[in-house]
Amino acid sequence: LEALEKINCNVKKEFKSISPKLGTLEEYLLAVFDLFISKGKACKRSGFSLTLLAMETSELSPLIAEKCSDILENWRLLLADGLYDRNLPEDLCNPISEWLFTSIQGAISANRIHKDEAFLYNIKSTIKIISLASPEFLREIFTKGNEEEIVA
């Protein structure tokens, strides 16, 4: 657990350091994505694999799986804060951060399993779509007809 907390502190520090430096939404999202990719390379793996660690340990060590899950949720909340800091409407920050964070985790996991960079390039396309879309279009995608958030 101590090693997980060390990773968490390191990533949170780097996560927060990107926020004030990059102004546009696209630059910010690409920097966040690059942070996860670079952490994977630093761990000598093809992707930052806290998600896979949580999956692999869920039955053997629920405590480790829960810690991984808590760390990932904390990082997702940092992403939501970063979206808000870039003037994304507040009602869109959580659903978009949930969708994007889940997509990033999936792409990194798929890249690691299949050893195929295409999964990582899909995230860059997703970032471009989020960056170029109007708030109205994003609301259409990320909210239900009765204005409730879609749960990712």
Question: What are these language model-derived features?
Answer:
Residues 2, 31, 35, 52, ...:
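Alpha-helical elements of Rossmann-like donor-binding domains used by nucleotide-donor carbohydrate transfer enzymes
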Residues 2-6, 15-46, 97-100:
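Hydrophobic alpha-helical connector segments
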Residues 3, 7, 11, 15, ...:
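Hydrophobic recognition helices of helix-based DNA-binding modules
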Residues 9-12, 27-31, 42-45, 61-85, ...:
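Amphipathic alpha-helical packing segments from all-alpha helical-bundle domains
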Residues 11, 46-50, 103:
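N-terminal alpha-helical segment
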Residues 17-23, 83-92:
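Surface-exposed helix-capping loop/turn segments at secondary-structure junctions
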Residues 18, 36-41, 49-59, 82:
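Helix-loop "lid/cap" segments that line or gate small-molecule binding pockets
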Residues 62-72, 85-130, 134-146:
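Hydrophobic/aromatic-rich alpha-helical bundle segments in the mid-to-C-terminal region
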